[in-house]
Amino acid sequence: MMVLSDEKGKNHDDPDEFVINVEYNYVHDFGVGITNDFGGIKTGSKGPQCDGGTEAWLEERCYSYIRVYNNLVRDGWPYLCCANFLYSDVSSSGNLFQNNIVHGSGSVALVHHCGLDNESRNNIVHREAQPDNHQVWS
């Protein structure tokens, strides 16, 4: 089990200040129409202690201070909804999404959900128009 610390991540311009660097990946054809609510590259909480309702947001129990850069992410297909290309999920804080290319079909290019101090810089998004043939949940 990886233990993440909040000691790093104070300086987004210094890659050595991040706990995890996700770099130079080619992520493609993910989801393939069999699942929902996912990301090509996703950061998120490990459990209920990271639900944003406690002081645990920036403690080692949460996936924080991740630098996602220089990745190519393309073509994600959900079953019903929510194929997110770059996805910072619940309470994932202090992350930097930089110099990524997002291309093709999917739902949303970049999502920051309920975290603190997440940044997006210099990302290129090229989306093809795709018809939405699914019903929206109500």
Placement of each model-derived feature along the sequence:
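Right-handed parallel beta-helix
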Residues: 1-7, 11-33, 47-77, 85-87, ...
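Low-complexity, flexible helical/coil segments
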Residues: 105, 136-137
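Acidic/polar loop patches that form or flank catalytic/metal-binding clefts of enzymes
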Residues: 109-110, 131-135
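Extracytoplasmic/periplasmic beta-strand context in beta-sandwich domains
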Residues: 38-39, 84, 108-109
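Sequence context of c-type cytochrome heme-c attachment sites
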Residues: 44
